[in-house]
Amino acid sequence: MLEVLQESLRKAPIVIRGEYPYFIHPISDGIPSLEPELLDEIADHMIDIAGKDYDRIVSIEAMGIPLATVLSMKTGKPMSIVRKRQYGLEGEVILSQSTGYSKGELYINGISKGETVLVVDDVISTGGTLKALLPALENMGANICNVIVVISRGDGAAKMSDMGYNVNTLVKIDVDMDGVSILEVAGEQQ
């Protein structure tokens, strides 16, 4: 299960950001190359989890864009991208987010009250992005049917659970200077 994803994670190079070992991967960074087989495998698994009973796919710039795009094409559902810059459109919602290595504002456009949304993202580490995004979507009147993240690292998914949000993850990993260790695949320990 998710063999292409697992193999690509095992081959991921590790760099140090401050004191933080950081893995470089096509899903989280877009480099070295985001292959169609990897996107296809991930999208099919996300569809298996979420089905198609929602109105819109919501994801976060930048690396949520390829995930949302392939899901949109496979399901025929429209997508909205939460951006990192302001457009000043009517109804735009601004939220502050803080991740394990950055802080900033996010801008939500194109989501209507009463819509049922599927939220997808590339990685959850601290949970900072989803901690800001999910309540904001609910405050806008959106119904969140599911949250799916490709890669879980750290305790972010557990923190979201403590807030009442179930985050489905495709793989849970640990990263050190020796590389990426795969701890769980689709909820099953390895």
Curated annotation (Swiss-Prot):
Gene Ontology molecular function terms on file: guanine phosphoribosyltransferase activity; hypoxanthine phosphoribosyltransferase activity
Assembly description: Homodimer.
Record keyword Glycosyltransferase present: yes
InterPro entries: HGPRTase-like (IPR026597), PRibTrfase_dom (IPR000836), PRTase-like (IPR029057), Pur/Pyrimidine_PRTase (IPR050118)
Catalytic activity of the protein: IMP + diphosphate = hypoxanthine + 5-phospho-alpha-D-ribose 1-diphosphate; GMP + diphosphate = guanine + 5-phospho-alpha-D-ribose 1-diphosphate
Protein name: Hypoxanthine/guanine phosphoribosyltransferase
Protein localization: Cytoplasm
One Pfam family here: Pribosyltran
Gene Ontology CC: one annotated term: cytoplasm
Biochemical pathway: Purine metabolism; IMP biosynthesis via salvage pathway; IMP from hypoxanthine: step 1/1
GO terms of biological process kind: IMP salvage; purine ribonucleoside salvage
NCBIfam families to which the protein is assigned, alphabetical: HPT_Archaea, PRK02304.1-4
Role played: Catalyzes a salvage reaction resulting in the formation of IMP that is energically less costly than de novo synthesis.
Magnesium among keywords: no
Enzyme type, top EC level: transferase
UniProt-listed Enzyme Commission number(s): 2.4.2.8
Family: Belongs to the purine/pyrimidine phosphoribosyltransferase family. Archaeal HPRT subfamily.
Keywords of the record: Cytoplasm, Glycosyltransferase, Purine salvage, Transferase
